[in-house]
Amino acid sequence: MANDQNRREAEALTALARALAASRPDMEPTLREIEGLAAAALGRPAPIEVERGFEQAARRLRTGWLRSVAAETARVLRSPTEREIERLAHSRHDAYGYERDFQPESLEARCEAFFGPAPPGWTAAHVMFSSGQAALATVLLHLGERRRGKLEVAHVGSYFETRELVARACAPARNATDADCIIVEPMACDGRFTRHDPARLARRLTRGQVLVVDETLSAPATQAPAILAEAVAGGAAVLRLVSGLKLLQQGLELANVGIVSVFATEADLAASLADGLKRCRTLTGAGLRFVDALALEAPFFLDREATETYAGRVFAHNAALAQAVMARNRRFKPLGGAGLAGAAMPYCAFELEAGNGVEGLEALACRIEDEATARGLLIERGGSFGFRGHRFEVIEPETGEPPFLRIALGARDDHSCSGLIELMGRLAQGGAEMRPRWRPAGGGLHPE
């Protein structure tokens, strides 16, 4: 079984390399290197060494692609000459007069095939930004343009940067009914996962209101069809927001990107919102840079089948982790409410039932490191989620919420994935005292 799983990862990496080499001929040397690294990894005796070989191959693939992209973009100034603009116009890339006004029309056109057409009676437009948060900030800027006072926003979710952005730029609405804009996270996490129902909010929209649905934690799956099936009032709009860095790039993190899909039953409203977002994008520099757009020309980005397969493995592995922990749990608080049954989560978040502080969580993190080393499991300290390999970190929110341990299992179905699931199930039972390699000193945590 393990050999089959390793062969699948080797084949996946070489398939990605072949796709990139087909797109850029100067990637041929990288393709040959990846083929060699993948084959060498398969020949290593220890499972952890096999996985390290795959990690090396993935990093080399990313490096080769970004080096190729950088070599091309280095030949074009950020304010190109007329001759350079003409040359770009005759290439497969989007031309631009100055980079802050770069319009990634080719990538935005690919969004319709990826996300699918708008339902009957709806018009859709897709706008890309330099990140998910840049996208949201631009949305709030544009929506507030014609308001006499501050834009009134209701935030139904947990993401701390969204909360801070709304607090800095907008006025909090007393409730969703009174809000100019409602931001909802269908899957939210602040140490515990919570589900929210955007369709219920859509039913209550009135003319002039905008519902922003942040699906970053659940992409590429979407609730848009269910939301748009509601009797949304004319003159209201629904915007879907996705950060494309996490689960849409096969774990390679080629470039930050945020995607806003604008839906309205009135074609003029959809066009006006999309055009306004694009203009604000130029004014604030919130758009993609030319080098980012070329990096995102990777054929697997916005490939529906490839993305669903990849993200599906991430969700499945973290679901298995959650189930293993909860089945034997005597150490952690519940991961979330009963409404989470069957929910897809791209990582797991754990709070200790007793003594949930940074010191206790750090002690647990050190125990995980020790046990992983003893068992030959590959997991690294680091943030975010959606990688090919596995990560974990202790998070202490700046906003005052309780700290928590995040474990983000990746897409690789490897020895470490199954081993970490088994390890966390055992640790969830409690029992043996965890002696930290860290001790409090001078108000902080310091190594022994």
Segments (PLM) and residue ranges:
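Alpha-helix termini
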Residues: P119, L143-R148, A173-R174, A199-T206, ...
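Glycine- and other small-residue-rich loops at beta-strand/loop junctions that grip anionic moieties
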Residues: R100, M128, H155, E185, ...
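Structural motif
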Residues: A154-S158, V184-A188, D214-L217, E351-E353, ...
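Active-site C-terminal subdomain of aminotransferase-like
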Residues: A17-R24, A39, G43-G64, A233-G400, ...
